[in-house]
Amino acid sequence: MSQLHTNSKEVHASSSNSQDDKLQKRRARLAAWNQKKASSEKSENNEDKKPKIESSKLQEWIKRRQQKSATPEVPSTEASQKPTSIKPILRARLSTSSSKQTQLVPKKRSIFDDDDEQDDAKTAKKDFRIPNEKKLPASTEEQESEDEEKVLERIRQAESGTSFLVESGFEQDLGADSGISGSEGDEEDDEEGQQRLLSEKLQKLTNKEKKLMALDYTQMEYTSVRKKFYTPPEELKDVPPEKVTALRTAMDGIKVRGSDCPMPIQKWAQLGLPSSIMTVLEEKLGYDTPSPIQSQALPAIMSGRDIIGVANTGSGKTLAFVIPLIRHIMDQPPLKSGDGPIGVILTPTRELALQIQKELVNFTQAVELSVCCCYGGSPIESQIADLKRGTEIIVGTPGRVIDLLAANGGRVTNLRRTTFLVLDEADRMFDMGFEPQVNKVLSQIRPDKQMVLFSATFPKKLESLARSFLVDPIEIVAGGISVVAPEITQRVVLIDDSGDISQKKLQALLKIVDEFSVEDPEGKILIFVDKQEAADDLMVRLLNNQISCIVIHGGKDQVDRKHAIKQFSDKNGLRVLIATSIAARGLDVRGLNLVINYDAPSHMEDYVHRVGRTGRAGATGTAVTLVLSSQEREIRDLVRAMKMSGKVDDIPAELQSIADKFLKKVKSGEEKFNSGFGGKGLENLQERRDNVREIEMQMYGDKVKETNGVSNSSAGRKALGTPEAAEIAGIKLPDFDIVEGRAPETSGPDRCKFHSRIEINDLPQKARWVVVNRDSLSKIIDATSTSITSKGQYYPPNSKLPKPTIKYGREIPPPPKLYLLVEGLTKSAVQEANKLLRQKMIEGVDVATEEDAKAPIGRYNV
């Protein structure tokens, strides 16, 4: 027992000895630290005395300088000619003082408490470094003396206790060299600059508008071109006006407006065409006599006049401008290397361009001319190759023609030799908003060109616009405006809108197809619907009912669209084609004897073009329209179209009564008529122009809107960085606003005090990838100690959010557009993360721009 007691005493003694040793070591280190602190305070006091010593030395130096300037020196050597500079002295003095002060900063030790660290921080005073020598002005005598005076003044301010860097010109240089951050105002300017840069890059990336070289034909010399190729034959000379009017009335009621319009012809020989063209007309195509629109339009165009031609569908409008175009080109000298086309034909759709090319080839092969069809959705390389070889005629859509004119800086082709321009289906072209593209093409063509406009419908609203392009035009209307050809039999099937409407319409369609197949087993059937989805759905339903068919709409690739038309046009191909109104223009298929409007057209002009796909070139055809009893406006248009085409007896009494009820509603103000092709594209274009103009006025401070009497002064300053500015190009610029408070979409104990939502849905795909990839986000998260989460759902550009859904009696909003949620404990952390994300966006847009420029389009850049 005594032995155990002795052992416990020894253990206690040894432990007390070890504690004493540790305490002594701690006291020794504390004494050393106090000694070092005292020495640093002493050296600091010495440093405080230095400015007084330096000030006295500086006064002595100034006196010596003044004495030297008062007594002229004899220049003996090159060294004596140079003035004494204060720069080396100041540089050496400030560099030594800076090095001394950096040595005084003690290293932190983990054994001291927080109070010791605060005392330690007091001794480490921040000092400024001398500006970079490279940034100082050149060492001329005047500049050097001015710099010395400025530095001396700043040293005096430093001695008096004021900072000589506050208003100095060297502040930015010192901040750059020493890592001193700017004020909050500078940070805001940097953010606005980054936001402006991002906006400009996004607009540049999304702005696909091709710039064409401006041409001033008033300063150019170009050879005159012969336009008049028609001389009236003896049999048509000196005909009294009464007989001319009677002849025009007999020819489908031709109406002419304009001065000096020639008399209509009655046979091809009266045009005086070359034998090669006459052979194609009479032998290859089998056209014995011209149609009414051809009888009047051909002599007018071949007389060199500008024309507005309006005629029924299938009346031969294409041939009315093809023959004068071929005759016009044959009279001109052949193309030389680098010459562009002589004739240009613009169309609103690709299918119409292909149809016109098919008509042109019949003549170009006979007279050894070439034609190039240019439209989007197909490889551009072959089109560029054809233009490089030289082609006399271009047929295409306005967008692709501009692409080719702008390709390779305008070296692919040009329109300097173009003297004949045709706008086919001009009303639809303007209605689709092609006016800017048409103006661009016109700016590249010499002003003395001949221009021809043709269409089956031509609203008065667009007539004034069309006349602005033409010079003293002649307007020719054959068969009336927006009138169905008399060769077409029109029928309307009225469907009750109660019960399963879709099934009722399908059964009615199947019945019509079966009846027609019995009467005409080889006849083609064209079915029109309103929407692309409806076309695909109807194709599936017809296939399920053992009816072979094919579909065409704007959502199909050009290869598929071309294949579908080829399959439908082939004599042994498919009999049924389902299409949207994209096939309502220019589609000319032999044997197409039945057109079915599965969805009633929204206005009469569209109806005229749809049913005009049958009954072409004098042949007969049938048009059947399925309409619901509740579609009063559509029924009124159908009744009006049938009356205008002389089919009053074919109008059912029930249909007429519904139309009369609708007219009463219109008179009472309850309803209004459809405007048809009334220039919606022009109105939308003008609206966009007004929006852009308003934003530009806000940007440049010309007009600032006021709300509730308070001027929104920041609108002009931030216009470039606002979403509205970028939405001009179709992209919403991300917002980087920081909100104080916890984000509602997060939960749990780790929610942060500040957050920011940055929408990235509308950014280009490559830019989004650069921002949200794992490496980029992890680096930003580590650098800023924030949380960044990708949320929401991606929506295609310019698409609207779906409507809220009702589930269990509650309204559930749709998922928001794709965005990044940035969360942080401090506002500065979130602000820094936003800054880094903005930089990543700029990098991503640059990458997207480079890839877009390097897209594989062959040897040429478009």
UniProtKB/Swiss-Prot annotation:
Signal peptide: none annotated. A motif (DEAD box) lies at residues 424-427. Residues 38-63, 120-136 have a biased composition (Basic and acidic residues). It holds the Pfam family Helicase_C. Residues 94-104 have a biased composition (Polar residues). Residues 298-476 form the Helicase ATP-binding domain. ATP binds at residues 311-318. Residues 1-195 are annotated as: Disordered. Its EC number is 3.6.4.13. GO terms for molecular function: ATP binding; ATP hydrolysis activity; nucleic acid binding; RNA helicase activity. Belongs to the DEAD box helicase family. DDX46/PRP5 subfamily. The Q motif is unique to and characteristic of the DEAD box family of RNA helicases and controls ATP binding and hydrolysis. This is Pre-mRNA-processing ATP-dependent RNA helicase PRP5. The gene is PRP5.
